[in-house]
Amino acid sequence: MLLSANGLTSVKDLMLGVEAYESRRSPASKISNLIRSRMETELQTAGWEVMVYPTEGVLLIQSPERSRSTDRYLHYVFNFNTAAWGFWRDVKSLSMTMLRERIYYGDSEGSIWYMVDGEDNVTLAAPAADGTPVEFSLLTAYSSGGLPGQVKRCAVIKPIFRGVGLLGSNYKVLYDYEFEELPAIGLNSTSGAIWNTAKWDAALWVGSNTTNIPYSTLGGGIGVVMAVSLRGQSTGRMTLMEITAFYEPGGVM
């Protein structure tokens, strides 16, 4: 892969004579506008790199450090499993390399880091409790729920995660192409209930590796299409298995 002012281009396509500006053929076509807008002012800035990270199944575009208070470090990541783009935020990388299937990167303070496990800022000689939770943010694709043209109101939602460690999450339904990133929330130490002693209406029933989150009763909101904005943090590797949603359809717009 080659990264240029035209975006991300396959070497194979270039050898076949495909024009680099044909963004629809690029694996980064969905974020080409983001890449190009940054290239306009940062093309000559050191810090651009492209690599495949097989262990995580992602294609990574590292971008230069920016002098700003938010998203100072922002790297673009394509997940081969979901065929979706996302960001790595606050990974203070100025240069990256692969060694034995692991990413190593250097920061502006002269430190070298590597990516492993489910926590951040873990020291080499780690005590029993070390590191900080990794934060994440997600906005699902908007959907009409199989009822295009009809307004609808979501009553309750419930995300289901599978993994190990502690998890804390905050989530909300958005309507008609709103964009809102929710505030962060602390970790939730709640685990599964004990069968013979827990009360049915108050207990959370989970598997050994499933983190259960209570159903959230939602407030206002109505629209034709819906999406879920979710933000949280965890101390271990987590997989979002599904988001269960119950909604009421209304009349035609």
Feature annotation, model-predicted:
Residues 4-253:
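Beta-sheet repeat architectures centered on beta-propellers
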